[in-house]
Amino acid sequence: MKRVTLLLTAGLVLLTATALPILRAGAQTAVVTDDNLSESIANAKTPADHEAIAAYYDQEAASAEAKAALHRRAASNAKPVGMANMCNGLAQYWDKVAGEDKDLAKAHRAMAKGAGSGS
């Protein structure tokens, strides 16, 4: 009886020792940055991978929206020096970038759902 208990305990310890690192690796999703974006997209397979990429694009869209707002404010201040058109053009550019980033985030969220359904 002691021997069976010892073997079961040893087996459980061995199983835990091998499963724990695997579970931790699966639970850790790397943060997507400018530096690893291409690699993250190329290696994305799980819903968590695509959600991390979508979060990156959400941040990029928010940054672009902030730049657009900055240039809209600058346009109202730049009217006296004749630079309002340039500022408005930059605001439109950043609005377009924000829209594209939102579309990319939406696409990766759709891929996350597809990866989660096994298709």
Roles of regions detected by a PLM:
Residues 1-4:
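Positively charged n-region of N-terminal signal peptides that target proteins for export
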Residues 35-41, 62-89:
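Short E/K-rich amphipathic alpha-helical oligomerization segments
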Residues 91-116:
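Amphipathic alpha-helical coiled-coil segments
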